[in-house]
Amino acid sequence: MTMKKVEHVHATYDTPHLNAAVGVFALLANPVSVKMILAIRDIEVSANHLADIVDLPVDQTSHELHRLESAGIVSRQRRESGDFYLLNGVHAGALAEAAIFHAEHQQQER
């Protein structure tokens, strides 16, 4: 494998957002979080519905949703029928998808 010669931009790796980015990767290191992020990429769902989708108890699902909400990855919309969750933007979903595609590619190369 040949390495590309790349001109590094200092701001890309010396950023005040580095710790927050590492926090996002820490959340993505949890399979439950990745399942949830992938499940709500295109829809907003209640904690009960999401628990059914990811096959977890509602209390565990709610706990994980709170962690994702605290990190700013998901947001909660309060409605008369209850709370609904959705991704804040596409970035976390894109990271989770990229990780899955990377893992699939690595598996195919073996």
Q: Which positions does each model-derived feature cover?
A:
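Alpha-helical residues within the helix-turn-helix
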Residues: 52, 69-70
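Residues within the DNA-recognition helix of helix-turn-helix
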Residues: 64
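Residue-level marker of intrinsically disordered, low-complexity segments enriched
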Residues: 1-7, 43, 56, 71
